[in-house]
Design a protein with these regions (language model features):
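Extracytoplasmic
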Residues: 3-155
Length: 155
């Protein structure tokens, strides 16, 4: 009898928190929160990358995109899942620095090459970080909506 009382009490106390978690997830999806919902154009661009790029190409992309790309493509990213990226805080800071680059474009391209970056994904997430001076120096490879995939030219 005491067991049943404890079981019912535990269920009664845990049910509201479970409902809150489910409701907040559904609310985020309904609002189109970019942390949970992938834009159709970004999804198409990701599919194109998976279909056309050579395995293990290094891509510079924003934090959310960098978290998703390796899950759907064979590409590698500068900064991906924070718990699976060694020195994640340093790489995220580098990513923000690169997308906010306002110095000489040639120095930015050199930095990308030194890091081994072959492609840059530049879409709404990356645009919100910055408008790097080196973007016009890249070669456009593919475009879907506002999303663009650029190749870092060889010197």
């Amino acid at each position: 009898r005491r067991f049943i009382f404890l079981l019912v009490g535990t269920l009664a106390l845990s049910l509201p928190s479970h409902c809150l978690v489910i409701a907040s997830g559904l609310s985020s999806v309904a609002r189109g929160d970019p942390a949970l919902v992938v834009d159709r154009h970004d999804e198409e661009l990701t599919q194109w990358i998976g279909d056309h790029l050579i395995d293990s190409e290094l891509i510079l992309a924003g934090p959310r995109t960098g978290n998703r790309l390796p899950a759907y493509t064979p590409a590698r990213v500068i900064y991906g899942h924070p718990f699976e990226t060694p020195k994640a805080a340093e790489w995220r800071a580098e990513l923000v620095r690169l997308f906010g680059w306002d110095q000489d474009p040639a120095n930015g391209l050199e930095r990308l090459r030194n890091l081994g970056v072959r492609y840059v994904l530049y879409s709404s997430e990356e645009m919100a970080i910055g408008s790097p001076s080196w973007i016009p120096e890249l070669d456009l490879v593919h475009e879907v909506g506002v999303g663009r995939l650029y190749k870092v030219p060889t010197p």
